[in-house]
Amino acid sequence: MSLTVGVVGGCGHVGLPLAIALAAHHEVRIVDIDLDAVARVRRGEMPFRDAGADEALGEALRRGMVVSDNPEVLRECNVVIVIIGTPVDEHLNPSFTVFDRLLNQLHEVLRAGQTLVLRSTVYPGTSERVQNDLRRRGLQVEVAFCPERVAEGVALEEIRRLPQIVSGFTPAGVAAARALFAPLGVELLELRPLEAELTKLFTNVYRYINFAVANQFYMLAAEWNIDFHRILHAMKHEYPRAAQMPAPGFAAGPCLLKDTMQMSAFNNNQFFLGHSAMLVNEGLPQFVVNRMLRRWPDLMTKRVGILGMAFKAESDDTRESLSYKLKKILSLVSGEVLTTDPYVSDPNLVEESRVVELADLFVIGAPHRRYRELDLKGKPVVDVWNHRGAGSVI
C-alpha cells in the first residue's frame, strides 16, 4: 500500500537517506528548517556524504519527492516521521525543549487519522509523553516509535538491508508503521514502545562501553610502553570469543555519549558502567596529550598538525568530535595547532599540504583512508588507531 509520507528534519543525516529509501515506494514530502540544505536537496545535491545516495536522490526527485521548509505540506500525509531526538542539557540530563517546541508547531498541521512516527533516539517514555500531549490537544493521532539504527555514511544502504523495529500504542499505530516499512522488503520486529526505546538506547550504550573497554586497555598498555595493537591482534586472531573487540580510538559523534547519559538519567543516575565509559572515552584526548608531553617535553616549541576533524573516518560530520577537544588541549601546551580534514567545512582548517609542510609532528584525529599512505616527510605521528600500521605507542 502506497502512503503519503512526511519527513520532518528530512534533509539531515538520518532523515534524508530514509526519505530517499521510502520515495521508491511512497509519495514523500520532506520538511526542514535548514534553508541551505533544502535548496541543495532540491537541486539534487547531497548535503553530506552517504554511500550511493547521490544517484538515489536524483531518482527520488524524479519520482516527485517534495522538499520544502513549509510544514503545510504535511497536512495530507498519512504518516509524519519526526527526525528529532531528545538531546542532553548542560547537566547531561535529557531535555524535552526541542520536542515541546516541535509539537507546538506540528499541532497546527496534524489531523485525526494520521500516524506520527518518532525515528530518532529518545529518552525512555518520550513516545508516551508525545501521545499524551497530542491527546490533551484533542488530536486523535496515532504515535509509533520506529528507531533508526544506521551508521552515518552508509545509512541508505543499511535502511534497505537492516531489520526495522516497529512499535505503537494501538493496533492501528502498529499497522501504519508496518505499512510504512514493509515495502522495503526487510524484516519487521514488533515491540512495545518502551521496549523499542530501550532497544535503541541499549544498542548505542553497548557500543560506547565496548569502545571504552578498548580505550582503557590501550591506555593501560601505553603506560607500560606496550603497543596495544599487537595484543589486540593476538586476542582476535582466529579466536571467536574476542572477535567483537573494537580497536581503540576517539569514541565520539552525536549519539553515543548523549545516549549513555540519557540511560543514566533514566536509572536515577545509578549507571556506574556508563559513567566509567564516559570518563574513559572523554579522557582519551587528555591521555594522548599527557603522553605527548612525556615524549616531547619541549612541545611548547613545536607545531602540531591534527589530521582529521570529523568524528569518524570518511565522514564530514564534526558533531561532538573529540578532535576538537584534542585541539583545545593541545593549544594550551604546544606552540601551535594546525588542523585539516578533506571532508569538513570549517574556515579554521588549513590545507593538507600546508599542514604536512609546517607541522613538526602529527596526531591522527579521524582515520580517513587517505591518511594511511599520506607522505608525512618522516615526521613523528601519534596514531592511537594504528591507522598507518607503525604502532600506537606514544
Predicted feature residues:
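Structural/interface elements that position substrates and couple domains in central-metabolism enzymes
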Residues: 1-394
